[in-house]
Amino acid sequence: MKENELKNEKSVDVLSFKQLESQKIVLPQDLFRSSFTWFCYEIYKSLAFRIWMLLWLPLSVWWKLSNNCIYPLIVSLLVLFLGPIFVLVICGLSRKRSLSKQLIQFCKEVTENTPSSDPHDWEVVAANLNSYLYENKAWNTKYFFFNAMVCQEAFRTTLLEPFSLKKDEAAKVKSFKDSVPYIEEALGVYFREVEKQWKLFNSEKSWSPVGLEDAKLPKEAYRFKLTWFLKRISNIFMLIPFLNFLCCIYVSRGMCLLLRTFYLGWILFMLVQGFQNMRMIVLSVKMEHKMQFLSTIINEQESGANGWDEIAKKMNRYLFEKKVWKNEEFFFDGIDCEWFFSHFFYRVLSAKKSMRALSLNVELWPYIKEAQLSCSEESLA
């Protein structure tokens, strides 16, 4: 009994130590008021910003010695307005260059800490890399990654997607050189953790809607899809583009009917595209939302249009309960749901080319294929 009590005490001590250790992780998001203040601090500490500030010394001397103030004024205005743009561009390029030189260390951190697609798993990786880059003088501050999500996105854009898109070994070696074996090991660890999360998600974390029989799709509440769409784009997310569209209607009142119709049609088309992309961005905030979408497609028993209607109802309820969307109107109907899957998941997988501001979903490729296969089998049945 005493031995068991000692073991229990030790296990409690280990757990409490791990909890304390996790609490000690400090990232810039814990030190700065917002990402904007962190960004301003990083710019202030950059070499490009200091060079831009030093440029004002010779300009001030020129102003004092010059008899003609026109040329100093022109140069000063150029430095004033174009200088910040160059500072931002140079700082962005410096970040990419610094990180590209530390790919091996990045991979070692991923291999050692085994993060999954959950952003919280990347906190240790982000904290360790922040310290490593500063201590090895690869970066001039201790705050390279603002938070875990920024670190995870850097892993995706720097390693995961570029490496996965390389077609053969020669192309990988040409682009990543000596880092190839480390990247392969890190990606292997990451994919295994994502697979564990997928299996856990489908078994223990499986979500089942309650009272779905009474749920209605937006197509049953709105007479036309355009009415539903106009209501959606008039919300807070699309308020500025919507007001811009109203402004375009006012500005175009002097045009001929044909030109005005074409112009306003093009503006409305751009609004539709922005709304569709916004939905995918909202869904991509957490990987578990995309996993739920794919899992719902795979596990749907009904086939054809009725099956997609059921998927749309379930996802509308899920996204509303998870507070991803403010109501149960994310998908208009089954056709809209099927288009969403085809456009943002299967099409990207087939082309293996990322869309603007959207992820390639490399870690979800096997499950996207499985979802597409289940759709094909249902249509054949």
UniProtKB/Swiss-Prot annotation:
This is Protein COS1. The keyword Nuclease does not apply. The gene is COS1. GO terms for cellular component: endosome; fungal-type vacuole; fungal-type vacuole membrane. It is found in: Membrane. Present with 1730 molecules/cell in log phase SD medium. The chain crosses the membrane at residues 43-63, 73-93, 232-252, 255-275. Belongs to the DUP/COS family. It is a multi-pass membrane protein. InterPro entries: DUP/COS. Coiled coil: none annotated. It comes from Saccharomyces cerevisiae (strain ATCC 204508 / S288c) (Baker's yeast). Pfam families: DUP. Keywords: Membrane, Transmembrane, Transmembrane helix. Residues 64-72, 253-254 are extracellular. GO terms for biological process: protein transport to vacuole involved in ubiquitin-dependent protein catabolic process via the multivesicular body sorting pathway. Residues 1-42, 94-231, 276-381 are cytoplasmic. The keyword Transmembrane helix applies.
